[in-house]
């Protein structure tokens, strides 16, 4: 008669035979432990054990013990406690120890495609979905002894490689960017992995925008700098856009002939004709012309203030100046504010008004309109016209409130190399074809090309396929040169266009992606609160309200989810240290699953 007893504390086994012989601490044949993959591993022998021996004198014989019952396969709820993986018995776990358990294999089913890896591989990243036993428990199928995920199969090659390589994330070539990014979010690889993935794919990392430390300055800065931050910020943005549009419309209307003539008459009214004054003798007897009693100097400044265009311009400049000063005093960094191109445009948009106003005031000074200063006045008028032209740059102020203009500006900035190559190719073509058409038309008396520099204009409008027709070749040789010039221009312009379009698409999708992420963060119950996205993009609740009882692909009932959720929420703290409670919850899930199948 032979009775096999359970394992001893030193790792060996004990067998009691009917003949009075016993083997303590080990058996003749080393016991084997079944692994999760079906292989066998010899258990370590006890310390100081021999093959078979009788009871020595003075040694206390062991009392008889009941035979060891066969251990059933453990539930995943016991495994999630950190004591083993589904499919590993208690005796096997005690025999193998933590080191062997670390190398146990786990089966992952991705939409019918099975992957096999080790628990230690997944445990490298415990904060992820697959690395955290509590998170991946929701997807365990106890009947098939595997984890099932209804996700994109090709993407899991890159996800599994992330665990196997220790953190290197590589997107499979047959998976699109948005699909793989969605898988990264589902498996909860973290923000750091997402940022590395975006950098590897060529995405530019967005710099964090600083905010003022003072609460009042922060609120003012958000209102005037970020129109989407609040309702008041949107109202300020609408007012700013309206003022910009009014300023641009006024700038265009004041150049119409009817308005221009009226303004000139208002600013410089005609002086009534006065008869010539009689010469009078001065104190020294010299003749001098006495001023007429009725002649007066036209009050230019009051008449300028009465101009409706000047009033509208003054109102717009007051708003622009107020907005610029408020943003300057509320900005977090004065140096960064001064280097910002948009703020430079704001300054350029308002300083022509003050220069014009200063010129008007200078004309009011005595002797400001003397005849000896006609040349200086003409030069000042030319400079003033150029300064007034700068007002047209106010249209770029709209880019502060327009995402489309911002995308266009970023596209041009990113395509400066391609634009430089385009200008360089055009420059070469202009030199080449202007020289060729000049020599081709040199013998013709009626030619339009008197010199090579005169032919530059023709070469530019021909290569850009504009063709004004003011200058054209007459001879056969000149027409051949013109045809080659047009073909070369089309090819030169068409070559860098795809790169520019690609940059535009990149910045456009980047902006839309930012808007989607911002909307995702604003939604209640986002991933920061423990939720995730399933394959269809729908929200999945936290694990206490998720699928607790999926068995054999059957759908759990609402009652089973409710019962399991209540139990887990009620005993959540105890369940982490009470294996019996988790075992009872697992039995509850199996019972509800069987009821659903029936």
Swiss-Prot record:
Disulfide bonds: none annotated. Residues 254-308, 363-380, 439-452 are extracellular. GO terms for molecular function: alpha-actinin binding; delayed rectifier potassium channel activity; outward rectifier potassium channel activity; protein kinase binding; scaffold protein binding; voltage-gated potassium channel activity; voltage-gated potassium channel activity involved in atrial cardiac muscle cell action potential repolarization; voltage-gated potassium channel activity involved in bundle of His cell action potential repolarization. Residues 1-195 are annotated as: Tetramerization domain. InterPro entries: BTB/POZ_dom (IPR000210), Ion_trans_dom (IPR005821), K_chnl_volt-dep_Kv (IPR003968), K_chnl_volt-dep_Kv1 (IPR003972), K_chnl_volt-dep_Kv1.5 (IPR004052), SKP1/BTB/POZ_sf (IPR011333), T1-type_BTB (IPR003131), VG_K_chnl (IPR028325). Residues 1-231, 331-341, 402-416, 509-598 are cytoplasmic. Residues 403-416 are annotated as: S4-S5 linker. It comes from the Eukaryota. GO terms for cellular component: cell surface; intercalated disc; membrane raft; plasma membrane; potassium channel complex; voltage-gated potassium channel complex. There is a cross-link at residues 205, 521 (Glycyl lysine isopeptide (Lys-Gly) (interchain with G-Cter in SUMO)). It catalyses: K(+)(in) = K(+)(out). It is found in: Cell membrane. Its main location: membrane. A motif (Selectivity filter) lies at residues 465-470. A motif (PDZ-binding) lies at residues 596-598. Residues 453-464, 465-472 dip into the membrane without crossing it. Keywords: Cell membrane, Ion channel, Ion transport, Isopeptide bond, Lipoprotein, Membrane, Palmitate, Potassium, Potassium channel, Potassium transport, Transmembrane, Transmembrane helix, Transport, Ubl conjugation, Voltage-gated channel. A lipid is attached at residue 331 (S-palmitoyl cysteine). PANTHER family: POTASSIUM VOLTAGE-GATED CHANNEL SUBFAMILY A MEMBER 5, VOLTAGE-GATED POTASSIUM CHANNEL. The transmembrane segment S4 functions as a voltage-sensor and is characterized by a series of positively charged amino acids at every third position. Channel opening and closing is effected by a conformation change that affects the position and orientation of the voltage-sensor paddle formed by S3 and S4 within the membrane. A transmembrane electric field that is positive inside would push the positively charged S4 segment outwards, thereby opening the pore, while a field that is negative inside would pull the S4 segment inwards and close the pore. Voltage-gated potassium channel that mediates transmembrane potassium transport in excitable membranes. Forms tetrameric potassium-selective channels through which potassium ions pass in accordance with their electrochemical gradient. The channel alternates between opened and closed conformations in response to the voltage difference across the membrane. Belongs to the potassium channel family. A (Shaker) (TC 1.A.1.2) subfamily. Kv1.5/KCNA5 sub-subfamily. This is Potassium voltage-gated channel subfamily A member 5. It comes from Oryctolagus cuniculus (Rabbit). The lineage of its organism: Eukaryota, Metazoa, Chordata, Craniata, Vertebrata. The gene is KCNA5.
């Amino acid at each position: 008669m032979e009775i096999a007893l359970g394992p001893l504390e030193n790792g060996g086994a004990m067998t009691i035979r009917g003949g009075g012989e016993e083997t303590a601490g080990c058996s003749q044949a080393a016991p084997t432990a079944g692994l999760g993959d079906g292989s066998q591993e010899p258990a370590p022998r006890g310390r100081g054990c021999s093959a078979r021996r009788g009871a020595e004198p003075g040694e206390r014989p062991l009392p008889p013990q009941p035979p060891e019952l066969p251990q059933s396969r453990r539930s995943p709820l016991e495994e999630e406690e950190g004591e083993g993986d589904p499919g590993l018995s208690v005796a096997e776990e005690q025999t193998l120890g933590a080191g062997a358990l670390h190398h146990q294999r786990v089966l992952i089913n991705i939409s019918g495609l099975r992957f096999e890896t080790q628990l230690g591989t997944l445990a490298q990243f415990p904060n992820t979905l697959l690395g955290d036993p509590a998170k991946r428990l929701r997807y365990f199928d106890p009947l098939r002894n595997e984890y099932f995920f209804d996700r994109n199969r090709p993407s899991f090659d890159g996800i599994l490689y992330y665990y196997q390589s220790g953190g290197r994330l590589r997107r499979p070539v047959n998976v699109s960017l948005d699909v793989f990014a969605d898988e990264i979010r589902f498996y909860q690889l973290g923000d750091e992995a997402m940022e590395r993935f975006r950098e590897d794919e060529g995405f530019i990392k967005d710099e964090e925008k600083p905010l003022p430390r003072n609460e009042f300055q922060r609120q003012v800065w958000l209102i005037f700098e970020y129109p989407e931050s609040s309702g008041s910020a949107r109202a300020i943005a609408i007012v700013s856009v309206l003022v910009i549009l009014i300023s641009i419309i006024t700038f265009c209307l004041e150049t119409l002939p009817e308005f221009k003539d009226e303004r000139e008459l208002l600013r410089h009214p005609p002086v009534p004709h006065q008869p010539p004054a009689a010469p009078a003798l001065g104190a020294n007897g010299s003749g001098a012309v006495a001023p007429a009693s009725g002649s007066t100097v036209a009050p230019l400044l009051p008449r300028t203030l009465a101009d409706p265009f000047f009033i509208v311009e003054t109102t717009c400049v007051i708003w622009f100046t107020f907005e610029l000063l408020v943003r300057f005093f509320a900005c977090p960094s004065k140096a960064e504010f001064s280097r910002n191109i948009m703020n430079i445009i704001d300054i350029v948009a308002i300083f022509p008004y003050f220069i014009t106003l200063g010129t008007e005031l200078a004309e009011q000074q005595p002797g400001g309109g003397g005849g000896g200063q006609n040349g200086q006045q003409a030069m000042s008028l030319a400079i003033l016209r150029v300064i007034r032209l700068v007002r047209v740059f106010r249209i770029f102020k709209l880019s502060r409130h327009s995402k489309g203009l911002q995308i266009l500006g970023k596209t041009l900035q990113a395509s400066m190399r391609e634009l430089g190559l385009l200008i360089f190719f055009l420059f070469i073509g202009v030199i080449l074809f202007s020289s060729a058409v000049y020599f081709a038309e040199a013998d013709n008396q009626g030619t339009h090309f008197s010199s090579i520099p005169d032919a530059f204009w023709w070469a530019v409008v021909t290569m850009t396929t504009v063709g004004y027709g003011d200058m054209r070749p007459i001879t056969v040789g000149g027409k051949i040169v013109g045809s080659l010039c047009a073909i070369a221009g089309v090819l030169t312009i068409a070559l860098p266009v795809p790169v520019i379009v690609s940059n535009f698409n990149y910045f456009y999708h980047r902006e839309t992606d930012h808007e989607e992420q911002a909307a995702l963060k604003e939604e209640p119950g986002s991933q920061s609160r423990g939720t995730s996205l399933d394959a269809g993009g729908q929200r999945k609740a936290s694990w206490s309200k998720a699928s607790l009882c999926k068995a054999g692909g059957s759908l759990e009932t609402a009652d089973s989810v409710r019962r399991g959720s209540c139990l887990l929420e009620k005993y959540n703290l105890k369940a982490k240290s009470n294996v019996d409670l988790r075992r009872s919850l697992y039995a509850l899930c199996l019972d509800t699953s069987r009821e659903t199948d029936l």
